[in-house]
Amino acid sequence: MNTLACIPAFNEEGVIGNLIKETLSFVDSVVVCDDGSFDNTLKEAEKSGAIVIKHNKNKGKGAALRTLFNYARDSQADIIITIDGDGQFLPNEITKLIKPIQE
């Protein structure tokens, strides 16, 4: 099953790169919505292997998630998960999260 991780992010350049790299160990692809960041979130996310969608101004987490869900719908992913961009979610928990869906 094709699994897509969706990450809304705002000014997360310090953690987004490692978060994406770790997440890619458990999913097929990662898409980040850079919600108007002033730092290098976009650059770090791209460098780490994510697809990045950029909001030119900060619209809030809800708008970032809406953008990500629209992308996910069009991507034909079988499983979609969301992870906050601040690094508080442990990517190694993804396996437990999606196991019931895969069964």
Placement of each model-derived feature along the sequence:
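Structured catalytic core of nucleotide-sugar glycosyltransferases
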Residues: M1-E103
